[in-house]
Amino acid sequence: MARTSPPPPVCLALQGGGSHGAFQWGVLDRLLEAEALDFRAVTCASAGAMNAAALITGLEAGGFDGARKTLDKLWREINLSGGKNVFGDSAIWNAAFSPSWMKDTPLWRSAESLAMTMSPYQFNPFNLNPLRRVLDTVVDYEAVQRSDIRMFVATTAVRKGRVRLFENAELTQDVLLASGCLPHLFQAVELDGEPYWDGGYLANPPLWPLFYASTPDDILLLPLNP
């Protein structure tokens, strides 16, 4: 049921956590269905960054209902990509996107062994990533770039060992892939000639941008890791 009064403005903080990002989808879907909150800014990392990009894409295209549809499409596409990935049904991909109980199985252990003995530069020399197709299908980068909803995406600068934030105007597919780049699975993503890894290593998610930006005081944090 639609609200009779404007929803309160808030900032959203979306933590990364691989396939656990689907939990955020569920929470966001319920909030959007209730038209409960007016999202003015989103700070995010890794899977949270992909949720954020889908959220803003949908809000810009069709409001609350549009955001629900876009998030639904994101996770359905991710689910489909799991069976059509660069590694096929190999252990390393399936283990990375499987529930925690998988860690005690031979599948997970073989994936760990592979990750310790080979780098993605060896087992994935062409740097193929099924998430590229998913993001191309779901995210409208131009819509996010011009949106009034501020977005802060965390990445890890490999050589400097520091976090780097990207905002709306800088958002590209490579920025999202860098924010979710696990170095045991994928080659580092090059941005402006510098290699980047998953932003969750140093800021999961970064909260300080919200302290200094002209954003609402209230922050809704959706954690994926305790």
Protein language model features and the residues they cover:
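Small-residue-rich anion-binding loops in enzyme active sites
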Residues: M1-A13, I149-R150, V158-R159
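Patatin-like phospholipase
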Residues: P6-A13, G18-F123, N129, L135, ...
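Active-site-adjacent alpha/beta core region of enzyme catalytic domains
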Residues: F87-L222
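Cofactor-binding loop segments of dinucleotide-utilizing enzymes, especially the Rossmann-like FAD-
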Residues: L224-P226
